[in-house]
């Protein structure tokens, strides 16, 4: 029985919760409704939770209130994607509720889950049931009920998991699209993984990290960061040493804990990755030979690598002396836009964007990424263009915590971002610009062409893995094995008699022949529409389209 949770135990709950989510991130990703190759729910929740875990591991405290503040800060700054932001808000409310406590009992644990739900619902502009919010709400309500008749935090957490799982299984009945695709809510599943890790910690158990099959062609680590090293002489261990050892039958039996302890005596920056056949090692040492000799106790050395880091540092200094690093531009009003692809970034810069954050579909920037740009620009005012629905909440979270007066224009696509930026008036006030830029978003119809990462049926459209998909905003309107057929079906849906301008932004994977045939088709079918073509260079999406 566990009647009290202090900072030490809560830290272990966080660590085990983060590990369990990490182990199941791919499973959570697979539950995403849309088969688009983007920054998925599992990935974003995992990165967010990992940020919270790392902050906790670096600032341990026996006081649960103090540890909660640390955890909340790590989640807040590391939040990526809407699912990550909601996760951070759930625990922001949770941790706020315990900030004055040194330890908590089952009743306060239940009340804190409820406080987290209330905070998260307030943070979402239009809460949707059948999502992570519903699972969190149902679990918290169950916790409040159970806490009335148990003082055991283990028993309480077990009940929370049962009710959270029931709620998760019911999500398709609340959200039609989940039922159509045949999945439960991915965010709710991610939250359940965290709760299951919490229970493991309360029981004194550990969530083991998944052991991935090791790639025999790659070493553990290749690059060195000399940030903070002023003199070459400051480098204590001068040789970056790496080895791969294939375990031998008649050699010493491998015990990871013993292996790590022994290897740590040779130097620092130790990394050890192993599976059933091979162990990979990276360590900074003065004696590479001793490292290799130790490795031979376990089996055959199959790859070795030694780099002189002092010589690397001398080369870094030589290069820095010849290349002055440009400082981040400081401005009165920062116009910060999220971009994907060099061509798109150049378009934004030419239109007046002062700062570009690389991100978009495959890697959503965190709250901290956006905050850093605002702070380093030393601006008094900031306008943020997320250009992706999954970056919107992180942008709003960043705007709410910086000292500068910051606003977010709710752009959900690159074309919307371009249209909004076109409306920026250097002489207008921040609020005036916010109003006219936001208004322009409604005048643009956005489309895109990409490929499917799995078989599914959604919005009445049958989709096969690797087939092309045409989307208008978030709705899939066409999916064919032939790229040109998919594009023309998409454009027929987008273009109308009163359409005036079609903007085409070409991605890095677009084929020239398809582009040429597409332009010819547009000119034949829609001769009155003016066509503007730009090289965007964006990954994942062969084309972005906008119609005005």
UniProtKB/Swiss-Prot annotation:
GO terms for biological process: glycerol metabolic process. It comes from the Bacteria. Residues 8-200 form the DhaL domain. PROSITE patterns: DHAL. Gene3D superfamilies: 1.25.40.340. This is Uncharacterized protein SAOUHSC_01193. GO terms for molecular function: glycerone kinase activity. Pfam families: Dak2, FakA-like_C, FakA-like_M. SMART domains: Dak1_2, Dak2. It comes from Staphylococcus aureus (strain NCTC 8325 / PS 47).
